[in-house]
UniProtKB/Swiss-Prot annotation:
Placement of TPR repeats on the sequence: 110-143, 214-247, 326-359, 494-527, 529-561, 565-598, 616-649, 721-754, 755-788, 790-821, 831-863, 883-916, 918-950, 951-984, 986-1018, 1022-1055, 1195-1228, 1230-1262, 1264-1297
GO biological process terms, semicolon-separated: flagellated sperm motility; spermatid development
Organism: Mus musculus
Phenotype of null mutants: Male mice display strongly reduced fertility. Spermatozoa show significantly reduced motility and morphologic abnormalities are observed, such as primarily tailless spermatozoa with an abnormal head-tail junction, as well as short and coiled flagella. Structural abnormalities of the connecting piece are observed during spermiogenesis and multiple structural defects of the flagella, with a greatly increased percentage of flagella exhibiting abnormal principal pieces and end pieces.
Subunit structure: Interacts with IFT20. Interacts with IFT52. Interacts with IFT140. Interacts with CEP78; regulating IFT20 stability and localization.
Function: Intraflagellar transport (IFT)-associated protein required for spermatogenesis. Required for sperm flagellar formation and intraflagellar transport.
Family membership: Belongs to the TTC21 family.
Protein name from the UniProt record: Tetratricopeptide repeat protein 21A
Lineage, broadest ranks: Eukaryota, Metazoa, Chordata, Craniata, Vertebrata
Source species, domain of life: Eukaryota
Length: 1314
């Protein structure tokens, strides 16, 4: 054999060490075709034959090479091993071989020692192998082959300190050479040390040097898997199969990938079939390897029934090949018990115990079967015996789990059971420490066993979702922690996903639970339990229509859903919630007749049955339905039946707590409290009972002392962080944050790494306005616990306190900490920090906002690429977050008036979340803003059909219809919304504006009356008063308007708008055109002194209002500055006007195309007699497209420009602007007044009178100047009676109005006299 043909020898050694005996045999035969007399190859062939259990053939082969000096030593050692494996041992031959071994060893060459060491290593005798290789290295003066072998021997040791030394020998063995086996050793070493880049570099060297050396590609595949790079893993697996279509490792990894990542049953089954075929053809006589390679599939097959059958069938064939192997029988028992096939499991465990009576795993499995069959006494007795054995053998997670089962089912000891479950989990995960992702990792992870533990925990968890503000049960947190690593690496496994969804549901994370269930249903649309849980989530959200839809959807996918009692139970709960108590009672009474299953674990029988916990829920729901239906006597009877039925069971306390609710509904508070007092600290539900008692003391008895006393008792009897948190929260509830702080602080000292405690302490300090202490606490706690979410809470607090630089520093430090290799949670946290940072920058570094949001979106895109592979249940939520970032970017572009970029961002948001109605609404609103009405309508129409978006869609469509001048449709849309919610003041406000703009403001009072009917408190509501104030302002009653707006001025929602309008009314009570001079010559000077005094009083009042105005938003600050300078403008004093103008110019420069600032500039220029400059600004505004938000200021700007044109005699240009005003506001009395003025100037008195009539109508006859002009034009048009009538109307309200009596009334009356 050629000395440089290291690739063939490396393959043989690799396969020998991996126990691929047939591969060894084939590779040796290939070598022997070229080197027929090579003793080393003959030895390896013999080793392969021996491994396949053809012992006599192996002995013959080994005896043939026993005389060769290179293989004599290894042949003798192998012969000894072979003889000892025989059913009948030839003692004489063994003795002869042992004496021969001593003699040969003394004179063995380095080569002989090398092969002997190899064989001992293959057989797992590490110490002996090391002894031989050390001897060989002495004899050979440091052979490189010897160093490589010594490196491998140490590398595969079970002792970590020995493994670490292996690299030294591997380095020595590969120095100045590309020894394939040595390089493989180095790559494997780096992999064990999780230096994946180093391992990949070495593996690439091997594949470059020997492209056909498959073990190197297999190693690369395993390396990519260890790095959790599934794409590269699968690609490498496919490459291996191109070279070797029956490669066992490749098919195993591809099968694992399909089971844990894709979840496609058909493909998974195909890949498992291919793995079994590869094992049966590639290694036909190797049952140990078969078992080793199929075990991971056995652990992962989950709900895939086809895969389960393939695995169980293959394991049975392995058992038939080795009928004396108790391990295979035990594994079959374990496979069946995990799939709740207890009968089959029992048979196999019995078989295992026949073969090996003291096999711990088989005994434990047998006890598990007894527990599931309800044989608790016998199981407990057996466990006592095994606990003694366990002490000598070390802890077994299965035995600890079984102890927990017995504690829960036989002795009803919740605390002991949960403590044992926790211990089982700790023992389980301790065996996985340091393991990289690999088939071995998945095998040890054993997801279905963890699901069994999780389900046991759930028996002690609340049965209903957590209410807002209530603490999450620590047990639910424990279950989430158990399942988290499973769901992370195996997101396509149904059972862990489903139980995770249950945990999220019970924790009150309803949307997260929905996302997880959605993933379950994508994997298997026929999964009954997932449909039922999804409908329960909708029920908890109050979405009864979707609850029913979900149930029917489940039926459409799987008719067996209807046979499930839970289907009818959920339906009954939905009926109860919607008030159909009679139908709910009928349904519940029907399912009460369904028999109860004995075990909680699950049902495999065909006939429907309910678990005890489900039956308890059904009875309690029936009690509730009867109570709500007024059948209290029947409710009490059913409750008593439930108490009798569940006495002494885990459901007893739950029934007791429900009985308390029934007693309370009857008003029997004392009975309720007595029942709760009967629950002792040793019983489950003790915490819930104390919480219920506390609630009664607080809300019914109004006794704060006894309320707190309940939580103090809880802390005394069940001390721990959870009880302390409840006591602290109780103090917070009664507004005693100082005492809450003491409790939180004491609990924190005992648990300095509990971030939830830090969060509460921080919130308590904020509540007591001790902001500096809160900041210090967050900063100190962050250093101790290193919890990133605390840094976000701290940054939010600093932002609230306007400490922008400090908030920026905190967030930047957190982002620097998170740099480097990131997992998904740290990336998610980084996105949160970036979004907070963008919020900070909005307040003090606007130029940085866009870049920060883009960074967040870029990072979120990377998360979305990784989530499908690692945590697929998070996809919907992460898509929503990406959409919200796009919307924030769009809003930023919108503020900058960059509409094209804004549109792109909103479309990007929709790409991330196509069905998110909020995103669709935002896009529709942008289309409306851009005047793309058809596209807006297209987006809004479907949203009208959905209840949760109907209101906003209707409001938007109403705006759209108004722009199309379809006023009736617009008003009807608002009307529909207000009929459902008359006290929706945001919509009422929009309707008042729409009625005004469509010329129907007289219809508004009817809607005010409708709102008042909802509640007697409506007239006190700030929103209602605001709407009334605006109404009175528009009908020309400024004093009434101020009275109502003042009632809304202090409100957080309506205050800013109310103050702005009040200031404008004070500065301009007659709603004149500021700067307009066309009508000034018509106004007499007789009252100029009193008019000036009135103006000054208005300015003083406006300034006083602004001194009490404290806006929190940036837009509010801008509004305040604008109003302060409008006060200066209203004085009409040149110095003040110039100061105001300077401010307006600054504002217009700061905010591109700011319409309020440009209008104010124009008004200031006119007051300063700089009309051309004013006209320039107003012409800019004339080109701006109309929007609802800017409507008022645009109308004022068009009227002011029309005034300038009127003064210059450019009536055509003025009329064009006035018609535009009327297009958007049919009630614009000023536009009609200017049109009347123009007609009057053209001596068209009839047309002038027509326009003044409309101006008089829409000013609600409140402006005497318009009345004067109308009467004058009636006089000119010889309509004397009409003129007299208008004069009387004016004089009734304004008896001293100048000139009207002499110049019009008397002349008209004189003209009527004959």
């Amino acid at each position: 054999m050629s000395s440089d043909d290291s690739s063939l020898m490396a393959s043989i050694i690799y396969y020998s060490q991996e126990k691929y005996f047939h591969h060894v045999l084939q590779a040796a035969n290939v070598g022997l075709e070229r080197y027929s007399s090579d003793p080393a190859l003959q030895f390896f062939r013999a080793y392969g034959i021996l491994g396949e259990d053809h012992i006599h053939d192996a002995i013959s082969e080994l005896e043939g090479i026993q005389s060769h000096p290179d293989t004599s030593l290894c042949a003798v050692i192998a012969l000894l091993s072979a003889h000892k494996s025989c059913d009948t041992i030839d003692i004489e031959a063994v003795q002869e071989l042992e004496s021969s071994l001593k003699e040969i060893r003394r004179s063995a060459s380095s080569t002989a020692l090398y092969y002997a060491s190899l064989f001992l290593w293959f057989m797992g005798h590490h110490d002996k192998a090391r002894e031989y290789v050390d001897h060989m290295l002495k004899v050979s003066s440091g052979s490189k082959e010897g160093y490589v072998l010594k490196g491998w021997v140490d590398l595969t040791s079970s002792k970590p300190h020995v493994v670490k030394k292996s690299i030294k020998y591997l380095e020595q063995g590969t120095q100045d050479t590309k020894d394939v086996l040595g390089l493989m050793g180095k790559a494997t070493y780096f992999m064990t040390q999780q230096n994946f880049s180093g391992a990949l570099e070495v593996a690439n060297q091997v594949t470059l040097a020997c492209s056909n050396f498959l073990p190197a590609l297999v190693l690369k595949m395993k390396l990519f898997l260890a790095r959790q790079d599934w794409d590269q893993t699968i690609e490498t697996g496919q490459r291996i199969l191109e070279k070797d279509e029956n490669n066992i490792d490749a098919w195993q990894i591809l099968a694992v990938h399909e089971l844990v990542k894709e979840g496609n049953t058909d493909r998974a089954a195909d890949r498992v079939r291919n793995l079994i075929k590869a094992l049966e053809t590639g290694e036909p006589h190797n049952p140990n390897l078969h078992l080793k390679k199929i075990l991971v599939i056995s652990r992962l097959c989950g709900r895939h029934q086809v895969v389960h059958r393939l695995v169980s069938g293959f394991l049975e064939r392995i058992f038939m090949a080795t009928p004396s192997c108790a391990l295979v029988a035990t594994e079959l028992g374990y496979l069946f018990i995990l799939h709740q096939q207890v009968k089959e499991a029992c048979l196999w465990y019995k078989e295992a115990m026949k073969l090996e009576e003291n096999r711990l795993a088989a005994l434990a499995g047998s006890i598990w079967c007894q527990i599931l069959q309800g044989q608790l006494e016998e199981a407990a007795h057996q466990l006592e015996f095994l606990k003694e054995v366990q002490q000598s053998l070390g802890k077994s997670e299965l035995l600890v789990f079984l102890q927990a089962l017995v504690a829960a089912k036989k002795q009803r000891l919740e605390q002991e059971a949960t403590a044992l479950l926790k211990e089982a989990v700790e023992v389980h995960f301790s065996s996985m420490q340091g393991l990289a992702l690999s088939p071995e990792y998945f095998e040890k992870l054993d997801p279905l066993f963890l699901v069994c533990i999780a389900k046991e925990y759930l028996h002690f968890c609340p049965k209903q979702p957590r209410s807002p503000g209530q603490l999450v049960s620590p047990l639910l947190k424990q279950v989430a922690m158990i399942l988290s690593p499973v769901v992370k690496v195996a997101p396509a496994m149904m059972e862990p996903l489903y139980v995770t969804a249950q945990v999220k549901f019970l924790s009150g994370e309803l949307e997260n639970a929905q996302s997880t269930l959605q993933r379950c249903l994508e994997l298997d649309p026929t999964f009954v339990d997932a449909h039922l849980l999804m409908s329960q989530i909708y029920l908890a959200q109050g979405n009864f229509a979707m609850c029913s839809h979900c149930l029917e959807l489940g039926v459409s996918h799987n008719f067996q859903v209807r046979d499930h009692p839970l289907y009818h139970f959920i339906k009954a709960r939905a009926l109860n919630k919607t008030g159909d108590y009679a139908e709910a009672i009928k349904t519940l009474k029907m399912i009460i007749k369904v028999p109860t299953s004995k075990a909680e674990e699950g049902r495999k029988s065909q006939s429907p049955s309910v678990r005890p916990s489900e039956r308890a829920s059904i009875l309690l729901e029936l009690v509730e339905a009867l109570r709500l239906n007024g059948e209290l006597h029947e409710a009490t009877k059913i409750m008593q039946d439930a108490i009798n039925e569940f006495s002494g069971t885990p459901e007893e306390m739950r029934i007791t707590v429900a009985n308390v609710d029934l007693a309370l509904s009857k008003g029997n508070v004392d009975l309720a409290l007595n029942m709760l007092r009967g629950i002792t600290p040793k019983q489950p539900c003790y915490t819930e009972a104390k919480e219920k008692m506390a609630s009664i003391y607080l809300h019914t008895r109004k006794d704060v002392r006894l309320y707190i006393g309940c939580y103090v008792e809880l802390c005394e009897h069940l001390p721990g962080p959870h009880s302390s948190l409840l006591l602290g929260d109780a103090f917070m509830n009664i507004q005693e944050p100082e005492k809450a702080l003491e409790v939180y602080d004491e609990a924190y000292r005992k648990n300095p790494h509990d971030a939830s405690l830090v969060s509460r302490i921080g919130q308590a300090y904020v509540k007591t306005h001790q902001y500096a202490k809160a900041i210090n606490y967050y900063e100190a706690a962050q250093k101790i616990s290193g919890q990133d979410f605390l840094c976000c809470e701290l940054a939010e607090l600093l932002l609230k306190l306007k400490k922008y630089h400090k908030a920026e520093k905190v967030l930047k430090q957190a982002l620097e900490r998170d740099s480097g290799v990131k997992d998904i949670p740290s990336m998610i946290n980084e996105v949160k920090c970036l979004l907070l940072l963008a919020k900070v920058y909005k307040s003090h570094k606007k130029e940085e906002v866009m870049e920060t949001l883009n960074l967040a979106l870029d990072l979120q895109s990377r998360i979305l690429k990784r989530v499908p592979l690692e945590q697929s249940e998070m996809i919907p939520f992460q898509n929503q977050l990406a959409a919200s970032i796009c919307i924030q970017i769009g809003e930023h572009h919108l503020a900058e008036k960059d509409y094209d970029s804004a549109l792109k961002s909103y479309k990007d948001a929709l790409a991330y979340s196509p069905t998110d109605s909020k995103v669709v609404l935002e896009l529709a609103h942008l289309y409306l803003l851009l005047g793309q009405l058809d596209l807006c309508e297209q987006r809004c129409a479907p949203l009208l059909e959905m209840e949760q978006t109907h209101e906003r869609a209707a409001v938007m469509l109403a705006d759209l219809m108004f722009r199309r001048q379809n006023y009736e449709t617009a008003i009807n849309l608002y009307h529909q919304v207000l009929e459902k919610a008359p006290d929706n003041f945001l919509v009422l406000n929009k309707l008042v504006d729409l009625l005004r703009r469509s010329g129907k403001l007289e219809e508004a009072p009817a809607f005010f009356e409708l709102a008042k009917k909802v509640s007697s408190r409506v007239p006190l509501e700030p929103g209602f008063n605001y709407c009334q104030g605006i109404y009175f302002w528009h009908i020309g009653q400024p004093n009434e308007a101020l009275r109502f707006l003042n009632k809304a001025r202090k409100d957080s929602t309506w205050g800013q708008l109310a103050t702005c309008y009040m200031v404008q009314i004070c500065l301009n009570p007659d709603n004149e055109i500021v700067g307009g001079e066309a009508f000034e010559s018509l106004v007499g000077d007789s009252n100029s002194a009193s008019r000036k005094e009135s103006q000054q009083h208005g300015v003083r009042t406006a300034e006083k209002l602004l001194r009490e105005f404290y806006p929190h938003s940036e837009s509010g600050q801008t509004q305040l500055r604008l109003l302060q300078n409008l006060c200066l403008l209203a004085t009409r004093e040149k110095a003040n006007v110039e100061v105001a103008l300077g401010a307006f110019i600054e504002m217009a420069q700061a905010e591109k195309d700011s319409i309020p600032a440009l209008l104010a500039m124009a008004q200031a220029y006119i007051l300063l007699k700089q009309v051309p400059k004013a006209r320039t600004q107003l012409k800019r505004l004339a080109k701006v497209p109309w929007t609802v938000d800017e409507a008022e200021d645009l109308e004022k700007s068009w009227l002011l420009l029309a005034d300038i044109y009127c003064q210059g005699g450019k009536f055509d240009l003025a009329l064009e602007l006035l018609r535009r005003c009327l297009q958007y506001n049919k009630s614009c009395c000023r536009a009609y007044e200017y049109m009347g003025f123009i007609m009057e100037k053209e001596q068209s008195y009839k047309d002038a009178a027509t326009n003044y009539e409309l101006a008089w109508k829409y000013s609600h006859q409140a402006n005497p100047a318009i009345g004067f002009k109308l009467a004058f034009n009636y006089l000119k048009d010889k309509k004397f009676v009409d003129a007299i009538e208008v004069c009387h109307s004016v004089l009734t309200e304004h008896p001293k109005y100048p000139k009207i009596r002499e110049e019009i009334l008397e002349k008209a009356q004189g003209s009527l006299r004959p």
